[in-house]
């Protein structure tokens, strides 16, 4: 179960202590448990909506989003901000883009990207709560956590060192594809809405993958984080839009 604890420690702020330093092989296997960690995150979010169901939807949406960000430690938001800064500041140059991504400071474009994504997520969470579709909150982090598998399975990792390199070199490919395929079927519980949400989600990943390859020749940890945030938002958006047009 060590890979599971590695995944839980990496993807959340939950107090997990590992007895030994993870090996590259364990890091690679940990990615198989990312969707399970997503289930834990989503389950907590849904539980909160059930406990505080009597609160105004606006306030509850703010609580859910704040808890969501806290649970993940803002890990993927950090990747989004770094990617946004690098994409604008890199002026189309691969090396400059990669260099800016390594800068720990957050520029104005990075801040703007965080504001936009958080506003969108807040509005979408609010609509889900208001329309009594809070159960879908469980599904969102699960699908978000298969984004790394999809990208690492299909896209070159451009840095020579780091956690991403371990994941790329030691990811169990067959098991990862099976888990990814199963997870992508989960939204079908919601019928046509779920199917449209899956399609929108996958289209966003295909587009982001194309953009990443065109600019830097592949992916980095930051771009994967950005893809998780954007993918989750597109998933929610397409689900909400289809809800109003199909119901």
UniProtKB/Swiss-Prot annotation:
Domain of life: Bacteria
Keyword vocabulary terms for this entry: Cell inner membrane, Cell membrane, Cobalamin biosynthesis, Magnesium, Membrane, Transferase, Transmembrane, Transmembrane helix
Any Pfam family hit: CobS
EC number(s) from the headed UniProt entry: 2.7.8.26
Physiological role: Joins adenosylcobinamide-GDP and alpha-ribazole to generate adenosylcobalamin (Ado-cobalamin). Also synthesizes adenosylcobalamin 5'-phosphate from adenosylcobinamide-GDP and alpha-ribazole 5'-phosphate.
PANTHER family: ADENOSYLCOBINAMIDE-GDP RIBAZOLETRANSFERASE (PTHR34148:SF1)
The protein's name in its UniProt record: Adenosylcobinamide-GDP ribazoletransferase
Gene name of the encoded protein: cobS
